Amino acid sequence: MTASPSKLAQLRELSVVVADTGDYDAIKRLKPVDCTTNPTLVKKALDLPVYADLIERELAWGREHGGDDRTATVNEVADRLTIGVGVKLAELVPGRVSTEVDADLAHDTQATIAKARKFVAMYAERGVSKDKILIKIAATWEGIEAARQLQKEGIDCNLTLIFNRSQALACAEAGVFLISPFVGRILDYYVAQGQTPASIDEDPGVVFVRTVYNEFKQRGSSTVVMGASFRSTAQIEALAGCDRLTISPDLLEKLDAEHGELPRKLSPAKADNAQFTPIDSDSFASGLAADPMATEKLAGGIDTFAKDLHALRKTIADKLAG
């Protein structure tokens, strides 16, 4: 008797599966289409043997080329390591690698554009074309405006930390390639408020992604919806059929071990053509201001990403000094 396919195998038939990790061995084992990185994942990768040569090479570069401005040297080594990890991952996945622009640039459009262009150039120098990468940017108004320009230059962007409809619609109107709504962090907020959902279909993170997905499809938007920040396999299963789902290795392993039918929950089949109403900075700001959850989680997410980047840089500074 043939064993039934795992839920992970079934999910791959419904959605593009993305690995939310820089763990080289986990990606080899789980075979996602895309993967995504951030400073925390890069910092963890520094402890993995597969990256040992990369780390030593870039630290040696830092020691050789570092001038009097130690901070600039550390920051450059951090960028080189980030791209180096991305290059290794690009060898493994058939699709894209998302690479995050510094979170402390989240409210600076021009600096975000400059950093994105730098990352694309660094990848190109290492033999990775821009069609293999996504530039990950926090979905502030300034970040979305940066993505609008980058998309015009053929640089595809992943707008992250999406918690609110205004953010999602502004990204779609700007022609952003992909957005990452954060399912788990939305749930976390409401659970902390004592509002635990009675069922997965009432999970506010799941409801938000379903709403955005359906509205995008109804409006004929080409912007990809990639659910992110999952707390359980139940949340993932509730979004089966979403364009893409970025999932941590532990939840991918659980899905690979589970069997039973995994029905499609989202489908563009009933989509109707419609047009987006342009969102300006004032309507964007008012939409966020009216949503305490999104306001808190966007600011908190940027702060967490910035702290993670500073932690990566501190680790590099310590290694350079050692």
UniProtKB/Swiss-Prot annotation:
CDD domains registered for this protein in UniProt: Transaldolase_TalAB (cd00957)
GO cellular component: cytosol
Catalyzed reaction equations: D-sedoheptulose 7-phosphate + D-glyceraldehyde 3-phosphate = D-erythrose 4-phosphate + beta-D-fructose 6-phosphate
UniProt keyword terms in alphabetical order: Cytoplasm, Pentose shunt, Schiff base, Transferase
InterPro entries (UniProt xref): Aldolase_TIM, TAL/FSA, Transaldolase_1, Transaldolase_AS
Gene Ontology terms describing biological process: carbohydrate metabolic process; pentose-phosphate shunt
Gene3D superfamilies xrefs: Aldolase class I
Subunit text: Homodimer.
Family: Belongs to the transaldolase family. Type 1 subfamily.
Protein name according to UniProt: Transaldolase
Species name: Xanthomonas euvesicatoria pv. vesicatoria (strain 85-10) (Xanthomonas campestris pv. vesicatoria)
Name of the encoding gene: tal
